[in-house]
């Protein structure tokens, strides 16, 4: 099974992906996590350091695939999760989609691509071009990480459009949304009511999730010295169980941008029950300028 994890930049995709990967490994799966981001920090919390990228390795070998061994590019992470970082082209040059393609090509050359029960692609930010939608070409399921805010749900909506487009030619389905570090879910609920899709899990605001990223450890590793964090791991184990159940998934139909703006801004301007999230129109419009 191949899973592509998408979501707005900075939403916590890599931290979530690493913990899901360990949870899947705890369920007896052989897991490979592939970081698809030029920052090459997707697997940091699994390995504790920035591993060499596929592109760096290919360049050092002058693109002679026959000179590369699996141990040159596949690094063992916490919990037995294997880790690969695709890397990326120089800033302002090249295509990230090409890098993903080269990564898959090399793993196939090494007879490694089909050795895993689960391959998880952790993909940077929003889908802004066909290149960064490339992991969807290989995925069975897409999981979207979001929170209860405008920007993240707008990004999620754009990603659903990419899933729908890729599903025309690939057996791809959306497994659902994962809400990360959010104290409310009213906007999430409003969005999935208008654009029906499963909500796999919504994680509350837990400071240790953020701290784990800084420490370079998964929650599962931290629980060894802090048993009180075991309840947090159960969230990720629950997500893993839902993925392993091979859900039917859906091909979503995105909401037009203006309709989504109206939908979410209406909830902000007229919050259910009053108070809480009420903002003036100027604040909302300023929020949308950041999209």
From Swiss-Prot:
Catalysed transformations (reactions): chlorophyllide a + oxidized 2[4Fe-4S]-[ferredoxin] + 2 ADP + 2 phosphate = protochlorophyllide a + reduced 2[4Fe-4S]-[ferredoxin] + 2 ATP + 2 H2O
Coiled-coil ranges from the UniProt annotation: none
Metabolic or biological pathway, per its Swiss-Prot or TrEMBL entry: Porphyrin-containing compound metabolism; chlorophyll biosynthesis (light-independent)
Record-listed [4Fe-4S] cluster binding positions: 95, 129
Cofactor: [4Fe-4S] cluster
Main location: plastid
Enzyme's top EC category: oxidoreductase
One example GO MF annotation: oxidoreductase activity, acting on the CH-CH group of donors, iron-sulfur protein as acceptor
InterPro entries cross-referenced by the UniProt entry: NifH/chlL_CS, NifH/frxC, P-loop_NTPase, Protochlorophyllide_ATP-bd
EC identifiers of the protein: 1.3.7.7
GO cellular component, one term: chloroplast
Positions of Mg(2+) binding: 14
Keywords on record: 4Fe-4S, ATP-binding, Chlorophyll biosynthesis, Chloroplast, Iron, Iron-sulfur, Magnesium, Metal-binding, Nucleotide-binding, Oxidoreductase, Photosynthesis, Plastid
Subcellular localization(s) per the UniProt record: Plastid, Chloroplast
Lipid metabolism as UniProt keyword: no
SUPFAM superfamilies linked: P-loop containing nucleoside triphosphate hydrolases
Family per record: Belongs to the NifH/BchL/ChlL family.
Stated role: Component of the dark-operative protochlorophyllide reductase (DPOR) that uses Mg-ATP and reduced ferredoxin to reduce ring D of protochlorophyllide (Pchlide) to form chlorophyllide a (Chlide). This reaction is light-independent. The L component serves as a unique electron donor to the NB-component of the complex, and binds Mg-ATP.
Full protein name: Light-independent protochlorophyllide reductase iron-sulfur ATP-binding protein
Species annotation: Pinus contorta (Shore pine)
């Amino acid at each position: 099974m191949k899973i592509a994890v998408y979501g707005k930049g900075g939403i916590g995709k890599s931290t979530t992906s690493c913990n899901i990967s360990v949870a899947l490994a705890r369920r007896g799966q052989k897991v490979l996590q592939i970081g698809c981001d030029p920052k090459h920090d997707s697997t940091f919390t699994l390995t504790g350091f920035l591993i060499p990228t596929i592109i760096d390795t290919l360049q050092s070998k002058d693109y002679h695939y026959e000179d590369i061994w699996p141990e040159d590019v596949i690094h063992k992470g916490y919990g037995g999760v294997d880790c690969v970082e695709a890397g990326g082209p120089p800033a302002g040059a090249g295509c990230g989609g090409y890098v993903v393609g080269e990564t898959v090509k090399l793993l196939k050359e090494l007879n490694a691509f089909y050795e895993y029960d689960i391959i998880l692609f952790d993909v940077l930010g929003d889908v802004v071009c066909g290149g960064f939608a490339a992991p969807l070409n290989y995925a069975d399921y897409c999981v979207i990480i979001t929170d209860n805010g405008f920007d993240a749900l707008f990004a999620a909506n754009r990603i659903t459009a990419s899933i729908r487009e890729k599903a025309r030619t690939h057996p791809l389905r959306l497994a659902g949304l994962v809400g990360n570090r959010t104290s409310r879910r009213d906007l999430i609920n409003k969005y999935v009511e208008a654009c029906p899709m499963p909500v796999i899990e919504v994680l509350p605001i837990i400071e240790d999730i953020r701290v784990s990223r800084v420490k370079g450890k998964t929650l599962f590793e931290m629980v060894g010295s802090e048993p009180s964090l075991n309840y947090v791991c159960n969230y990720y184990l629950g997500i893993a169980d839902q993925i392993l159940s091979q859900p039917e998934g859906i091909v979503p139909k995105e909401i037009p941008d203006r309709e989504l703006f109206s939908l979410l801004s209406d909830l902000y301007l007229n919050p259910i029950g009053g108070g809480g999230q009420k903002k003036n129109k100027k604040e909302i419009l300023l929020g949308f300028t950041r999209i």
